[in-house]
């Protein structure tokens, strides 16, 4: 998983300034909302979630504001980008496997959990669950397997029980700018 931390990125923004920061961070980003002790362990096999756990994960509410959800220092930040040499250039894979474009080596994430895609003009983003064991939720609603669901700036996405906020490149830069003040 990424070693990028929100506060470190805020410091980088202060060093670079707005225009240079936006050039340096041209990709969508995920900010982890719920890192818990014991849940950051690297896992080889997928751990299953009970039906009650799935329901509880999908019932958790959206943050009141985008900045409320990102106030905790040290939050993990993941770049949503294609890794060099990765297959399937039309999508960005996310999963527990080390060779996933966005690697989440967490016990309740499938090896290939899902993927991000985008519209031809790059103005819209989508997430698709690849038939994972513990599901993907967008805004608290379970995503049907193999169905692309639109995501916009600030949308909460859960991969199994792990919650993230999705940011477009401009949305992420705006978030970091507001934190840098």
Regions found by a protein language model. Give the residues of each.
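Short, charged beta-turn/beta-strand-edge "cap" motif at the junction between a beta-strand
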Residues: 161-166, 171
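Forkhead-associated
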Residues: 74-161
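Intrinsically disordered, low-complexity acidic Ser/Thr-rich regulatory segments
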Residues: 1-105, 169-181
């Amino acid at each position: 998983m990424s070693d990028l931390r929100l506060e470190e990125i805020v410091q980088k923004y202060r060093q670079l300034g707005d225009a240079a920061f936006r050039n340096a961070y041209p990709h969508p980003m995920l900010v982890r909302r719920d890192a818990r002790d014991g849940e950051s362990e690297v896992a080889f096999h997928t751990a299953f979630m009970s039906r009650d756990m799935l329901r509880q994960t999908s019932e958790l509410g959206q943050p009141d504001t985008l900045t409320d959800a990102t106030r905790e220092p040290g939050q993990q930040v993941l770049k949503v980008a294609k890794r060099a040499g990765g297959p399937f250039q039309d999508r960005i894979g996310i999963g527990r496997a080390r060779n996933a474009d966005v690697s989440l080596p967490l016990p309740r994430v499938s090896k290939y959990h899902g993927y991000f895609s985008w519209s031809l003009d790059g103005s819209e983003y989508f997430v698709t669950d690849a038939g994972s064991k513990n599901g993907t939720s967008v805004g608290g609603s379970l995503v049907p397997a193999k169905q692309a669901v639109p995501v916009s700036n600030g949308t909460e996405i859960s991969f199994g029980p792990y919650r993230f906020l999705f940011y477009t490149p401009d949305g992420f830069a705006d978030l970091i700018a507001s934190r840098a003040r």
